[in-house]
Design a protein with these regions (language model features):
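Conserved N-terminal beta1-alpha1 strand-loop-helix module at the mouth
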Residues: 1-81, 86-114, 130-133, 140, ...
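Short, glycine/charged-rich beta-strand-loop motifs at protein surfaces that mediate ligand recognition
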Residues: 125-129
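Glycine-rich beta-strand-to-loop/alpha-helix junction loops that act as flexible
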Residues: 118, 150-155, 173-175
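Internal alpha/beta core interface subdomains
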Residues: 169-170
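Active-site beta->alpha loop and helix N-cap motifs at the rims of alpha/beta catalytic domains
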Residues: 65-66, 120-122
């Protein structure tokens, strides 16, 4: 959800993580100060740990390392891979958004990213997407590379089958989970 009260959201998160096979939870909160992010992590990280779910912080490798998150996800406009890796160290996960670019994904992989993300595949309410990703990118990546890839952007139970068939290792779902009745 775009805005959350972590004390209330904690129960919703536990229910969502317990409802199926969830590989990771990414905390993405914008427009708040660092202390709010820290407090949110303090409340939600134990929920993910209790479910055996990897906890990834969006955009902030410094806070991911400081607060004990399992990793960080960075976009093309965030800290670069090398800076993120230096902050979180070799044991934590660093994932990189690559939009629809094979080149960006190969660079991220060569630098040592733990996964790459392609998208947005569908219209999304989570953020303004400036690129439209194509199934061919997933197909090519899954045929040529061993590094896991994540499909992002507007993914629902109804529109995800082609992404899985094209080779996405993971699906990032936001609204489909949090807007579900």
């Amino acid at each position: 959800p775009p805005q959350i009260d972590p004390k209330i959201f904690r129960d919703d998160l536990a229910a969502a993580l317990g409802a199926g096979d969830v590989g990771a939870f990414q905390l993405r909160i914008k427009g708040v100060d660092d202390d709010t992010i820290r407090r949110t992590i303090d409340i939600l990280l134990p929920v993910a740990e209790a479910q055996g779910t990897t906890f990834i912080l969006n955009d902030r490798p410094d806070l991911a390392a400081e607060t004990g998150c399992d990793g960080v996800h960075i976009g093309q406009d965030d800290a670069g891979y090398k800076e993120a890796r230096a902050c979180v160290g070799p044991e934590r996960i660093v994932g990189v958004t690559c939009k629809n670019s094979r080149h960006l994904a190969m660079v991220a992989g060569e630098q040592g990213a733990d996964y790459v993300a392609f998208g947005a595949f569908f219209p999304t309410q989570t953020k303004q997407a400036d690129t439209q990703a194509e199934l061919e990118t997933l197909e090519w990546w899954s045929e040529m590379m061993v590094l896991p890839c994540v499909a992002i952007g507007g993914i629902t139970a109804e529109n995800c089958p082609p992404l899985v068939r094209a080779g996405a290792d993971f699906l990032s779902v936001v609204s489909a989970v949090w807007n579900h009745p």
